[in-house]
Swiss-Prot record:
Disulfide bonds: none annotated. The lineage of its organism: Bacteria, Bacillati, Bacillota, Bacilli, Lactobacillales. This is Large ribosomal subunit protein uL22. GO terms for biological process: translation. The keyword RNA-binding applies. It comes from the Bacteria. HAMAP family: Ribosomal_uL22_B. Belongs to the universal ribosomal protein uL22 family. The keyword Transcription regulation does not apply. Pfam families: Ribosomal_L22 (PF00237). NCBIfam families: rplV_bact. This protein binds specifically to 23S rRNA; its binding is stimulated by other ribosomal proteins, e.g. L4, L17, and L20. It is important during the early stages of 50S assembly. It makes multiple contacts with different domains of the 23S rRNA in the assembled 50S subunit and ribosome. CDD domains: Ribosomal_L22.
Amino acid sequence: MAEITSAKAMARTVRVSPRKTRLVLDLIRGKNVADAIAILKFTPNKAARIVEKTLNSAIANAENNFGLEKANLVVSETFANEGPTMKRFRPRAKGSASPINKRTTHVTVVVSEK
């Protein structure tokens, strides 16, 4: 049986747009977990808080479920897929209305051993 060397965590239907979340994920992809957490702490962004929480969950999964060492972990894979969109309308002049799309995101973070 092959030894498991990676762990995954997901945050689903998060109220941040996928485009903004991908900007944050690009900062941490390929970094070791200590550096990634430090980067996220100093990123002034709503998406950074969500990604940080998901990363900590992935680290906890690696330690508790698979017995991996935190010091050896690297952020191997990160992606933000589009979740369901909430559609709203903004009233405009002359009785018309404009659509507003409130986008949501499914964030996935995978950590693996070096």
